[in-house]
Swiss-Prot record:
It is found in: Cytoplasm; Cytoplasm, Cytoskeleton, Microtubule organizing center, Centrosome, Centriolar satellite; Apical cell membrane; Dynein axonemal particle. Signal peptide: none annotated. PROSITE patterns: ZF_MYND_1, ZF_MYND_2. Transmembrane segments: none annotated. Keywords: Cell membrane, Cytoplasm, Cytoskeleton, Membrane, Metal-binding, Zinc, Zinc-finger. It comes from Danio rerio. The keyword Manganese does not apply. Zn(2+) 1 binds at C394, C397, C414, C418. This is Zinc finger MYND domain-containing protein 10. Plays a role in axonemal structure organization and motility. Involved in axonemal pre-assembly of inner and outer dynein arms (IDA and ODA, respectively) for proper axoneme building for cilia motility. May act by indirectly regulating transcription of dynein proteins.
Length: 448
C-alpha cells in the first residue's frame, strides 16, 4: 500500500505543530501547518484501514500534541463564526481566487477527521488531558446544531464539493454554502469522537463526566438524534462514507455506523455505574429516555445485542423514581479554549477580517501558482484511492461501482443506465471538478 509519510517525517511534522492566533489563519505559516495536518490525517486513515501500526496516533500521544490539534480546530470554528461572515459582507473584496479561503473552511473538517481516527484509542483520551472538556463542549455544539437543523428540515441532501474539486473561481457566496454543507459532515464526525470519549469515561476526570451528564445533558441530546435520525432521508437514502447514497431494499432495516454510535454512547452514559450515580433522572429526563423503548425493536437488538441491557434498564426506570444524585461540593475544571480565543479577540473581528482580506486572502499570481503546486503534491490521488475503506459504490443505486465518470474521475457507477439517470444530480459537481483540474494543470504549466 502507498504511504503518505514515513515515521521520521510524521514525527517532524507533529513536533512542529504550534498554537496560532486568529490573525495567523491563512498566513504562509498557517498554510504550511495545514498541509502537515492533511498529510498526517491521510496517513492515520491509511494505517487504521489497513490494520497497520498506528504510528500517527502514537506520536501525537508521546509528543503531547493532541491539545494543539484541538486548539487549532476550535480556533478555526471561532473564525468561521466570527470572522468569515464579516469577510463575506465586505463589498470591495473580489479575490482572484477563493481557494485559500476554502482551505481555511475545510481545516476544521480535516482536524475532526484526524481526531476521529486517533481518539478511538483510550491512550489518546488520556493524553488529551484537560482539553477533553473542550472536546466535549465542541461535540455538544455540533450535535445540538445537527438536531436543530434536522428538526427544521435544513439539512441539505446534496453532496458537498470536496477540497480536491473546489474551483478557485468559486464565489464567496458559494463558499458560504459549502461551509454550511460541511457543518453536517463535521457534526457526524463529532458524534464519533463523543462516542469514543464515552467509551473511555472511566479513565477520565470526574469533570468530563459532569460536563457530559450535568452541564450538557448528553443523554437527552442523543435521544433527539435517535428520534430525528439526521443521516437518513426517509427509507430511500442514508448518509454513509461522506455521501448521500441510495439504500438497497435489503439494507433498509440495517443500522448505519451513525445509528450504532448513538446507541453505544447511550449505553455508556446510562449503564456505567459512575454515570448512573451522577445523572439526575428527574421527570423530564426520565420522560425523554423512556422514548427510546419505542426504537428498541427486536431487529435493532439483533444487530446490537448489548441494547438488551438498555431495554431492561429502561423497563426498570419506568417503574421507579431514582434518587436524585448528591450535590457534593467539588472543584471542577472548565473548558478554556473557546472562551480564551473569544476574549482575546473580542471587538476585533472586523479588524481581523479587513487585515486578512488585504494581506492573506488576496494572493499574487506567483503565490497562487505555488499553492497549486503544493496542493497537487499534498493530495496525491493514487494515495487517496486507498483512503476509501470499501469498494466504491454506485452514485445512483448504491451497489458496487465498476466504472467511474470519465470527465471528473470522482463518481462511480455500476452501469451506463445508472450514470445517465444520475447525471442531472452529478452535473454541477462534475463541472466544478473538471474546471478545477483544468485550472490546476494550466497553473502547473505556467509555473514550470
Amino acid at each position: 500500500m502507498d504511504s503518505v509519510l514515513l515515521h521520521e517525517e510524521a514525527e517532524g511534522y507533529i513536533q512542529s505543530l504550534e498554537k496560532m492566533s486568529l490573525r495567523d489563519i491563512g498566513s504562509p505559516r498557517w498554510f504550511r501547518q495545514h498541509e502537515f495536518i492533511e498529510k498526517l490525517n491521510m496517513q492515520a486513515i491509511l494505517n487504521a484501514s489497513a490494520n497497520q501500526e498506528e504510528f500517527i496516533k502514537d506520536l501525537f500521544v508521546s509528543l503531547g500534541k493532541i491539545p494543539t490539534l484541538v486548539h487549532a480546530m476550535i480556533l478555526t470554528e471561532v473564525w468561521k463564526h466570527k470572522v468569515f461572515p464579516k469577510i463575506c459582507k465586505l463589498q470591495d473584496f473580489n479575490p482572484k481566487s477563493t481557494f485559500l479561503l476554502y482551505m481555511v473552511i475545510h481545516h476544521e473538517a480535516t482536524i475532526i477527521n484526524l481526531l476521529e481516527t486517533i481518539m478511538y484509542h483510550k491512550e489518546s483520551s488520556e493524553a488529551a488531558g484537560d482539553c477533553v472538556l473542550d472536546l466535549v463542549d465542541y461535540c455538544h455544539r455540533k450535535l445540538t446544531l445537527l438536531v436543530g437543523r434536522s428538526v427544521s428540515g435544513e439539512i441539505s441532501t446534496q453532496d458537498r464539493i470536496t477540497h480536491t474539486q473546489i474551483s478557485g473561481t468559486a464565489s464567496v457566496q458559494d463558499l458560504q454554502k459549502q461551509s454550511d454543507m460541511l457543518e453536517f459532515e463535521i457534526s457526524i464526525k463529532a458524534l464519533s469522537v463523543l462516542c469514543y470519549i464515552t467509551d473511555h469515561v472511566e479513565s477520565l476526570s470526574l469533570s468530563v463526566l459532569s460536563r457530559m451528564l450535568c452541564t450538557h445533558n448528553m443523554p437527552c441530546v442523543l435521544v433527539q438524534l435517535v428520534e430525528n435520525c439526521p443521516w437518513k432521508r426517509g427509507t430511500q437514502e442514508k448518509y454513509t462514507e461522506g455521501k448521500w447514497r441510495a439504500v438497497l431494499p435489503e439494507d433498509q432495516l440495517k443500522l448505519s455506523k451513525h445509528d450504532g454510535q448513538v446507541w453505544i454512547a447511550l449505553l455508556n452514559l446510562m449503564l456505567k455505574p459512575d454515570c448512573q450515580r451522577k445523572y439526575d433522572f428527574n421527570s423530564f429526563n426520565k420522560t425523554q429516555l423512556l422514548k427510546l423503548r419505542g426504537f428498541l425493536t427486536d431487529v435493532v437488538i439483533d444487530q446490537l445485542p448489548n441494547l438488551l441491557d438498555l431495554k431492561h434498564f429502561l423497563s426498570q426506570l419506568a417503574l421507579t423514581d431514582p434518587v436524585a444524585p448528591k450535590k457534593d461540593l467539588i472543584l471542577e475544571q472548565l473548558p478554556e479554549i473557546w472562551n480564551n480565543i473569544v476574549m482575546e479577540n473580542d471587538k476585533k473581528w472586523k479588524a481581523i477580517a479587513k487585515y486578512q482580506v488585504t494581506n492573506v486572502f488576496n494572493p499574487s499570481e506567483s503565490e497562487l501558482r505555488e499553492q497549486a503546486s503544493r496542493l497537487a503534491q499534498t493530495y496525491n490521488l493514487d494515495v487517496m484511492e486507498n483512503l476509501i475503506p470499501d469498494k466504491p459504490k454506485c452514485g445512483a443505486c448504491g451497489r458496487t461501482g465498476v466504472k467511474r465518470c470519465s470527465r471528473c474521475q470522482g463518481e462511480w457507477y455500476c452501469n451506463r443506465e445508472c450514470q445517465v439517470k444520475h447525471w442531472p444530480k452529478h452535473k454541477p459537481s462534475c463541472n466544478l471538478m473538471a474546471e478545477a483540474f483544468q485550472k490546476l494543470q494550466e497553473e502547473m504549466k505556467i509555473s514550470s
